[in-house]
Design a protein with these regions (language model features):
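Flexible, glycine-rich loop/tail regions that form catalytic "lids" or insertion modules at the edges
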Residues: 83-93, 100-134, 150-153, 174, ...
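Active-site cores of enzymes that catalyze phosphoryl transfer or operate on phosphate-rich substrates
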Residues: 189-210, 281-330, 334-341, 755, ...
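Active-site pocket-lining segments that scaffold enzyme catalytic pockets across diverse folds
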Residues: 213-273, 586, 595-614
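Subset of Sec-pathway N-terminal targeting signals
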Residues: 4-51
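Cofactor-binding active-site loop characterized by glycine-rich and histidine/acidic residues
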Residues: 249-415, 419, 627-679
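Conserved phosphate-handling catalytic cores of large alpha/beta enzymes
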Residues: 394-404, 412-448, 452-458, 466
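Extended, charge-enriched "interface" segments that sit outside catalytic cores
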Residues: 5, 47-232, 248
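Phosphate/oxyanion-binding active-site loops and adjacent basic polyanion-contact surfaces
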Residues: 225-236, 317-329, 361, 425-429, ...
Length: 943
């Protein structure tokens, strides 16, 4: 039997684990049963698939092992003729699988040829003598039988022309069949009508015309030219016009610097006069953007006209950190879909434009692919366009840029189809664009277009590329432009009159000279305030952090909501530990015991949902909570179903979203930032598993959260919950790097808080949505305080309180106090417990709950109460060079009353955030508490 199985594997090309080969045979059988080996035909006949319609491919794979013996015993076939039919079937499969390797993709003709013997006749035991014989086509060309000569020509035209398609790695049979039927129906002849051909030429003229205009008028200025990749503009035009016809209302575009100015003018319809002003140093910054940004980072939005009606286009703002804008775009798209109640995800679509080097090199690309079908992040598929100019700045050798054949191979991790297309064949480009859009709409899945092109100039216009790519640029300098070649082609075909191409060039230049918009814009009425799509951005932009807000909730309403979200249906069987948590929460709701952190946090969400706000809480393990405190998602121990108490308060599940994210910080945080910038009515929260891991998304924090408003005028209310505190868990589980966030603070760009009680957390979360503006909120959230016996709050504190920037010492007698200790967060309880043990009454402990904007006036007034206190001590758990000390010392100094001196008590300087051994942690903690409360000051140490 072992020999039989080995023979079976070899004869059926299963060797090497190529299980997809069996699926290909089955598809071939469905189209033409006689074209497969009789053994396989007998086996496939058992599925009754042709009579009943196609079946899931898994049914084939799951039976292969069991069927091997029976398949070998099946019919013996009908001789050499049948064998040749089978060989032709294998040839067809080879072209579908590997034809892209022979495709004419490189406009420069520099790509090294690939050895593809399996695309030749001899590999499949066929020869020139068979060329005039007819064989079953397997559906190629729409004919059941064809001469091998004609069939081979059709396969070459389809799979080795200007489009190289990779799709046989897709596991879903329906998707593979859909793609090869589309490709084979065209057969390499993309059949654009004359109007589309003329429009394609006009768009190429626009792409080239803008670059040449800028090149001659603003010599040497950076613009990151699209030249060489001009076909991007007709590609975008095709996708957007098809989107309009298919009912798409919004398209959100993300792209880096290459070609961005061209897309702004020729796709989104930015007035070229405004672009020229920017080249001349006359910027029209959003008045809310205090710093501004370079012109090739700026976003834009417009409504463009299509045959299907207006389509709103939004080009996302973009830093120079390549690909990081991708998840920001995806988050914005998801938000727009939810606002439109677009559950099918057909009305809002993302287009992401990448560079080849960044697409294969930046890890955030992989992270976003992994999110693309996850239920909390899916957007119905993204159209990816890789502007593949075959060079990354100065690096062009694939041996240096990647370890895969194609820059796009990372997309195969989610079985996305890839269409490689020669950028010098505009009609193939248009066909690929239309095919990609249709695939996205039909299958709600990502699709990649690899636009093979070149870069006519250097990385920027002041760069000399021949230094590092001498041979490539010898070819490029002699190479005609895509527009020139296509205009000549259309003139020869009689599609345009002689000289019409030149007339288009002149007409476009006249538009630029006149400062006229170069694409068709649509007039769209403003969204009325009564519309669910309306967002009052001007009001939020005018709001200030200092505007008074109330976070109080009527106590009766609070109790009602607390009872509602803590009453679990009888049919939901909770884990015993969770059942105990909810038993306690019901007691908290009744006022029998004070509320803990989890109770107050969930109740804050409930009050906001009840008021009409939405909630989106995302992060690793957020449903339960890393420290088992939240339990916002309950898992039935009998059925494994889940129950979300907060969803009792909303009419749509998406209004109360709690998502356990994939194990990514960078892409997920960026996604939530994008969501928050589009929907200010949702409390968007990203929680770190531990705050220490937030720096995995440092680029998001630096480029977007901290600076997005200053650079681009984009406001965000994203909340970061970052578990922070020193409990002896070592250097990777202690610090959210508070010092880094404080360093980023300026001009009221965000809030940084360290809440120490459940009531503070309750009012902090409510305040975030009740502010008259939107600012990122960075929270050093607790770990051990989640169950600390002293970290509790009453219902009255929740109902009637407010967020306190500063909490004074209610027990201190100002007349006795000689030393005032200032601190933030969990260390307060360490100080309080030690003070109580010592029986000290000459020390007051003040908690600074908001570190930015710093409450100077409040602290100065509080310190003034302690006229006999000569020493004020800032105490922190973090090492001296970390934490808040160096970032707030100037504020503390300012707040001192006459006769008061400032001191430091905390850990010594350290390159690592925390000690790795519990014994060291305990010793250091005891030392800093004693230094704060009783020990003499070491001011030399504090410098």
């Amino acid at each position: 039997m072992d020999n039989q199985l080995k023979q079976f594997a070899q004869s059926s090309q299963l060797a090497g684990g190529n299980a997809s080969y069996v699926e290909d045979l089955y598809e071939q059988y469905l189209v033409s049963p006689d074209s497969v080996d009789p053994k396989w035909k007998t086996y496939f006949d058992g599925f009754k698939g042709r009579e009943a319609g196609d079946i899931p491919h898994s049914a084939v794979i799951s039976h292969i092992a069991d069927a091997a013996k029976d398949a070998l015993k099946a019919g013996t076939g009908n001789g050499a003729g049948d064998e040749r039919e089978r060989n032709v079937g294998r040839l067809i499969t080879a072209y579908r699988s590997r034809g892209h390797l022979d495709a004419r993709l490189d406009p420069l003709g520099l790509a090294a040829p690939v050895n593809t013997p399996d695309l030749g006749l001899p590999f499949h035991s066929l020869s020139d003598a068979d060329l005039n014989s007819e064989f079953s086509t397997g559906g190629v060309g729409g004919q059941p039988r064809m001469k091998l000569r004609d069939l081979l020509a059709r396969l070459k035209a389809t799979y080795t022309g200007s489009i190289g398609a990779e799709f046989m790695h897709i596991s879903e049979v329906e998707q593979r069949q859909w793609i090869y039927k589309k490709l084979e129906a065209a057969g390499g002849n993309y059949q654009l009508d004359a109007d589309t051909q003329r429009r394609t030429l006009e768009r190429l003229t626009a792409a080239e015309g803008l670059e040449r205009y800028l090149h001659t008028k603003y010599v040497g200025q950076k613009r990151f030219s699209l030249e060489g990749g001009d076909s991007l503009i007709p590609m975008m035009d095709t996708i957007i016009r098809n989107a309009g016809k298919d009912g798409v209302k919004d398209v959100v575009i993300g792209m880096a610097h290459r070609g961005r100015l061209n897309v702004l003018v020729n796709t989104l319809g930015k007035n070229p006069r405004k672009l020229f002003d920017e080249f001349e140093g006359k910027f029209e910054h959003d008045e809310h953007a205090s710093a501004g940004d370079v012109k090739y980072h700026m976003g834009f939005s417009a409504d463009v006209a299509t045959d299907g009606g207006p389509v709103h286009l939004a080009l996302a703002f973009n830093p120079s950190h390549l690909e990081i804008a991708d998840p920001v775009v995806a988050g914005s798209v998801r938000s727009r879909q939810e606002r439109r109640k677009d559950t099918a995800r057909k009305q809002v679509m993302p287009i992401l434009i990448h560079g080849d080097a960044a697409f294969s090199g930046q890890g955030v690309v992989m992270e976003l692919f992994q999110m693309s079908q996850a239920r909390g992040f899916a957007v119905g598929g993204t159209v990816h366009i890789v502007v593949n100019n075959q060079v990354g700045f100065t690096t062009s050798n694939p041996l240096d840029t990647r370890s895969t054949r194609y820059a796009t191979d990372v997309a195969k991790m989610i079985a996305a189809p890839v269409l490689h297309v020669n950028g010098d064949d505009p009609e193939a480009v248009v066909f690929a664009a239309q095919l990609a859009f249709e695939f996205r709409q039909k299958f709600a899945k990502d699709v990649v277009i690899d636009l093979m092109c070149y870069r006519r100039w250097g990385h920027n216009e002041a760069d000399e590329p021949a230094i590092t790519q001498p041979l490539m640029y010898q070819v490029i300098r002699k190479h005609p432009t895509t527009r020139e070649m296509y205009a000549e082609q259309l003139e020869k075909a009689g599609v345009i009159a002689a000289g019409a191409g030149k007339a288009m060039v002149d007409a476009y230049r006249e538009k630029l000279d006149a400062g006229e918009v170069t694409t068709e814009l649509a007039k769209v009425e403003k969204t009325p305030p009564s519309s669910p799509l309306f967002v009052d951005w001007p009001k939020l932009l005018e709001g200030k952090l200092s505007d008074p807000v109330s976070t109080k909730v009527e106590k009766n309403k609070l109790v009602e909501l607390a009872k509602l979200i803590n009453t679990i249906p009888d049919e939901v069987q909770l884990h015993s530990r969770v059942a105990k948590v909810y038993d306690d929460r019901r007691k908290m709701a009744a006022g029998e015991i004070p509320g803990d952190w989890g109770f107050a946090e969930n109740l804050a969400y409930a009050t906001l949902l009840d008021e009409g706000h939405a909630l989106r809480l995302v992060g690793q393990d957020v449903g339960r909570g890393t420290f088992t405190h939240r339990h916002a998602i309950l898992h039935d121990q009998k059925t494994d179903n889940y129950y979300m108490p907060l969803r009792q308060l909303v009419d749509s599940p998406e209004k109360a979203t709690v998502i356990d994210s994939l194990l990514s910080e960078e892409a997920v945080m960026a996604y939530e930032y994008g969501f928050s910038t589009t929907d200010p009515n949702t409390l968007c929260i990203w929680e770190g598993q531990f705050g220490d891991f937030a720096n995995g998304a440092q680029v998001v924090i630096d480029q977007f959260i901290a600076a997005g408003e200053a650079k681009w005028g984009r406001i965000s209310g994203l909340t970061l919950l970052l578990p922070h505190g020193y409990e002896g868990q070592g250097p990777e589980h202690s610090s959210a790097r508070l010092e880094r966030f404080l360093q980023l603070c300026a001009l009221e760009n965000m809030l940084v808080v360290v809440p120490s009680t459940p009531a503070q957390a309750f009012h902090m979360l409510r305040r975030q949505q009740h502010l008259t503006t939107r600012k990122p909120l960075v929270v050093m959230s607790p770990k051990s305080l989640l169950r600390h016996k002293l970290a509790v709050s009453s219902l009255d504190e929740l109902a009637n309180g407010e967020f306190q920037h500063l909490i004074g010492d209610a027990n201190a007698d100002a007349k006795k106090v000689k030393r005032v200790v200032l601190c933030s967060g969990k260390v307060y309880y360490d100080l309080l417990e030690d003070q109580t043990k010592r029986g000290q009454d000459d020390v007051a402990i003040i908690r600074v709950e908001q570190l930015y904007p710093f409450p100077r006036a409040l602290l100065a007034a509080e310190l003034k109460k302690y006229g006999k206190a000569t020493d004020v001590v800032w105490t922190q758990e973090e090492p001296q060079n970390q934490g808040a000390w160096y970032q707030i010392r100037h504020h503390l100094q300012f707040c001192l009353a006459d006769g008061q001196n400032l001191h430091y008590a905390g850990r010594a300087r350290s390159a690592s955030p925390a000690a790795g051994h519990m014994a060291d942690h305990v010793r250091e903690q005891q030392q800093l508490v004693a230094d704060a409360l009783v020990n003499p000051f070491n001011d030399t140490f504090a410098e």
